[in-house]
Each structure stands twice: as structure tokens, then as C-alpha cells.
Amino acid sequence: MTSVERENQVSVLFIGDPHFKVKNYEFIPQFVEKILTILDRNPVDFVVVGGDLLDNHERLDVDPLNQAINFIDQLRTRHPTFVLVGNHDYKNNQQFLTADHWMNALKFWSNVTIVDRVVQHTCNRMKFVLVPYVPPGRFVEAIKTQLEEKELRAVKVVFAHQEFFGCKMGAITSSEGDKWPTDWPLVVSGHIHNKQWPQDNIYYPGSAMQHAFGQSVENTISRLVVRNKEFEYDEINLKMPKLSIKYMTVEDAARGNLRYKNTDRKRYKLVLSGALDEFAGFKKTAVYKQLLEEGFAVSFKIKPSTEVRSVDTLNGSRKFLDILTEKVQTTGDADLESLCKSFLAQG
């Protein structure tokens, strides 16, 4: 590419919704390494982290927090970096252009911009706008704190973390999201994990990493190339481990010799169905301990017991269930207590 061609375009790496948290802690170093390798091989003009770098609002877990800070530090040493404050980065979902988030100390670093207000950025004579999460219905209001509509129309791309009208969130189609005129600039947004174009000028690259076992969303990061009258994007699959769910009975699991193996490319969660006493017994076995050592996530699903229901019905009271609850509480087993509560909630 000639120097003239480089001057007439801007390339951006957009990283959507990483959601660093305790549950994906072991995968974060691999995630970071893959992104840094891509940046080293494919230089860009700047990087945008599209919000929700952390997951738990105002509750901070030390390990994911340290990994997030290190990730930003690694990015900014390579390229100018903009980090949008997502709703999960704020203390709650009602924040409107506030500094009530965990990233304020990072504002003192060079070559990184923490976007908790509307930010304008010019690169190769092209203008970009970056907007943090704001509650649905207030996106245009937020932009107008810095730009008039005439100025907005001169912008090439608006980067956001927002729910827009018509976007799909699983089986739900947004009816409360912000409406964005089709003759306004292109928006590239985080917040919605499903990759999609709800309209011609709104692009959701989707979340960069799978966040839950069984989630079917395709996870990529996007390298964007913006020219005067063109927009191109390359969706890059990081090939992170696939998180899958397998269902079976406690009896099946207790036999051992599962045909599922955790690898660098695939991890499993086992959902075991059975009765409370089966779960309690299984948790004391060598098979259960081995599953945990091999990295399996294990959860239990109580199989309704007709005997318990008939006793409760015949007595015409909750005496039996009261006794059951008391016995479970005396075990001091938090998982067993959780299972008992789930069982009682079934009626």
C-alpha cells in the first residue's frame, strides 16, 4: 500500500464486549495473546474496546480487574486505544455520561482514552465519534452534548455501546432501543452479543468471546477499514475454546469413562439430573473429584420426586418440606442448599 493510500483510509480494530470475569478467568490470557498477535501482524490506526471489559458493575473481582488493566496497557503500547465504558463497567445501567465506573485511574495513562463522555477523534482527516453506554432513548441526547446535527453528518463512524431499535437479542427484537436515522453516519456498536446489521447504517460485530456454556453466538473481533465513501470489515475468529453443555443422569456420570474430553479447543459443562440424595452421594465420589480436576463444570438439575409431592399433599401441610429444609441447612453444604431451594421452588 502506498503512503497516499494509507493517508486516504483509516483502519480500526474493534473488540466487542470481552466481559472479563471469574468464570472465564482461565481463558483471558489466551484471548489477550491472540489479539496482540493480530495487532502485531496487522497494524491499525487505533483500537476501540467496545464496552463491558468487566462484567459485574460495581462489584470488582481482583483477578479479572488486573487482567483488564494489563490488557489495556498492552493495547496502548501498540496503538492509540479508546475504551468505551459499557453498562457492565458502570455501577448500574442508569448512568448517563458519568464517571461512576472502575476506569478513572486509567485516564492518567498516555495513549488511552476512557470514553465516559462523547469523544471526537480525527485520524487522516476523517472524523470519528465515540459514545459510552447511555440508557435506551438517550443516545442522540448524549451526542448533542458535543455536536450539532450538521457536525454529526460529517462524521465517518460513531462507535457506541448501545441498544438500537430493531436489534435482535436472542429471540427478542428491541422495541425500546434508540432509533437512528438511516441517512446519518454508520454506527459500530457493542452491547449486543449477536453479530448483526439491524439496518444499513448500524453494525454490531458481536461479542469477542463466548460468555456462557451452550451459547451459540459466533464470536469474532472486527478489523474495519474506512475510506471516504467506503467501509470494509474483516471479522476475525480468535478460535477460542468452545464451551458446550452435555446433559446426563447422575447414574450415567457415576459410571465414569465419559466420552467427552476437555481440550484447548473445547470445554464442557455437565448438567446432571437426579434426586437430592443422588447428588449428595455423587459429590463424595472419586469420579466427581476427577471431573473437577479435569476442568469440567458440573451442575445439578433436580428430578421432581412424586413421593415428596404425595407426602406433602396427604399431610395437607408443609411439615415434611420444613423438616427437609432444616436437615439440608445443617449440612453446611452451600450447593446442596441451593439445590433444595430450587426443588422447593418447583412447588
UniProtKB/Swiss-Prot annotation:
Name the UniProt key words of this record, in alphabetical order: Hydrolase, Metal-binding
EC no.? 3.1.-.-
Provide the top EC class.
Answer: hydrolase
UniProt-annotated binding residues for a divalent metal cation 1: D52, H211
Pfam families linked to this entry: Metallophos
Classification via Gene3D superfamilies: 3.60.21.10
Write down the SUPFAM superfamilies for this protein, in alphabetical order. Answer: Metallo-dependent phosphatases (SSF56300)
Give a GO molecular function annotation for the protein: hydrolase activity
Q: Which InterPro entries match?
A: Calcineurin-like_PHP_ApaH, DNA_Repair-Maintenance_Comp, Metallo-depent_PP-like
UniProt binding sites for a divalent metal cation 2? D52, N87
Q: Which family does it belong to?
A: Belongs to the metallophosphoesterase superfamily. IIV-6 244L family.
PANTHER family according to UniProt? COMPONENT OF ATP-DEPENDENT DSDNA EXONUCLEASE
Q: What is this protein called?
A: Putative phosphoesterase 078R
Biological source species: Invertebrate iridescent virus 3 (IIV-3)
Source taxonomy: Viruses, Varidnaviria, Bamfordvirae, Nucleocytoviricota, Megaviricetes
